[in-house]
Amino acid sequence: MTTFHFIGIKGSGMSALAQVLHDMNYQVQGSDVEKRFFTQKPLEEKGIPIFPFQKENIKEGQQVVVSAAYSDEHEEVVAAKEQGLEIQSYPTFLGEFIQRFTSIAVTGSHGKTSTTGLLSHVLGSHCPTSFLIGDGTGKGAADSHYFVFEACEYRRHFLNYRPDYCIMTNIDFDHPDYFDDINDVFSAFQEMAMQVKKAIVACGDDEQLQGIHANVPVVYYGFNEDNDFQARNIEVTSEGTHFQVFVRNNHYGDFTIPRFGKHNVLNSLAVIALCHYENIPVEVLARELKTFEGVKRRFTEKTLGGQILIDDYAHHPTEISATIEAAKQKYPDRPVVAIFQPHTFSRTKAFLHEFAEALKQADHVYLCDIFGSARENKGSLSIEDLQALIPGAHLLSENDLAPLQDHRSGVLLFMGAGDIQKFQQAYEHVLTT
């Protein structure tokens, strides 16, 4: 029996795909660096072997899947080539694999992971559904009708996919180490749109997405009246957000989600529109939207003492604004404290002023050193450049987190795509010892 060997198995997409194949009774193993990542816990729970990188991992009879983070010079890739094994990159393998199912890609500059998780939750309650989420979560079922997966635009990886459906949440300028500008990002999404086989569900409130052309129907959702699916009469309570949905100006249903912020209403609308297209009963939608518990590292809360600690992946100004808005909606009587670790020097430099404006929406701001990519040149940029643009912002080190204790009833938002979690873990240790 063929064994799938994943080179870089701790990557979020790789981890999720390994879990999908394991659930479908394939033999799966992988290798990676020895540093611990949150993505490896589900691998360990499923008994999927994880080895340190070494060429001896490569053996006859394997099919090799390589993370896009590793080049052809990697010792295991070289060994696989020498043995004549089949080798595919993660996007190439996934692009072929999804053809077995009714495939639904979820893409966009922001909101991909949350929307993929929500759609998987709703569809999975109705019929067998496999899914691959960017938080490292994957589930496979051989009899699946649907395969829901997160499709990343970075380096145009999503052009490896030709899905039946595609949800497009928004188009924003990000990944400045690869994309030239917003027009370059749009061109990637436009190319993706031409590869979709049945229909596209897109946010009509997004100015860029309004310009998308395709050979299949484009169904728009949003708050504006000219959308096919529109959210109206939005009410925020202590339990979450209630709204009504109108389909081409006809009342379709009332929905409640246990989440806060306009972005979560939009994510829900995307799922409602896709499920309506697939004739999923409105009763199923209403029931399942109400019970979705969220995905990893997206507004993940815990209470310690009198403080609320929230872990969030927000690493772009748009995402930071959305996270702060959600915190203020849910906890209107508490001060919101932003603890932010910028991710990559290229992104920090490109959006320095936008980061400052987004963070100013918090009541207090703490900044951690920039988390740099191993592939980039630091240059002269430092965290002090961002601090200078935010009045009252403080610098925070992992060894001195005591200032956070001053905000006794605060909502502490630990935000970033690097290793901001180690700051939260260290702070939790301070509070409990």
Swiss-Prot record:
Record family assignment: Belongs to the MurCDEF family.
Pathway terms, separated by semicolons: Cell wall biogenesis; peptidoglycan biosynthesis
Species of provenance: Halalkalibacterium halodurans (strain ATCC BAA-125 / DSM 18197 / FERM 7344 / JCM 9153 / C-125) (Bacillus halodurans)
The enzyme's E.C. designation: 6.3.2.8
Annotated Gene Ontology cellular component terms: cytoplasm
Pfam families: Mur_ligase, Mur_ligase_C, Mur_ligase_M
Molecular function in Gene Ontology: ATP binding; UDP-N-acetylmuramate-L-alanine ligase activity
GO biological process: cell division; cell wall organization; peptidoglycan biosynthetic process; regulation of cell shape
Binding site for ATP: G108, S109, H110, G111, K112, T113, S114
UniProt keyword annotation of NADP present: no
Subcellular location: Cytoplasm
InterPro entries documented for this protein: Mur-like_cat_sf, Mur_ligase_C, Mur_ligase_C_dom_sf, Mur_ligase_cen, Mur_ligase_N, MurCDEF_pg_biosynth, UDP-N-AcMur_Ala_ligase_MurC
Main localization of the protein described in the UniProt heading: cytoplasm
NCBIfam families the record matches: murC
Keyword Aminoacyl-tRNA synthetase recorded: no
Role, per record: Cell wall formation.
Entry-linked PANTHER family: UDP-N-ACETYLMURAMATE--L-ALANINE LIGASE, UDP-N-ACETYLMURAMATE--L-ALANINE LIGASE-RELATED
Catalysed reaction, written as an equation: UDP-N-acetyl-alpha-D-muramate + L-alanine + ATP = UDP-N-acetyl-alpha-D-muramoyl-L-alanine + ADP + phosphate + H(+)
Protein name: UDP-N-acetylmuramate--L-alanine ligase
Top-level lineage group: Bacteria
Keywords: ATP-binding, Cell cycle, Cell division, Cell shape, Cell wall biogenesis/degradation, Cytoplasm, Ligase, Nucleotide-binding, Peptidoglycan synthesis
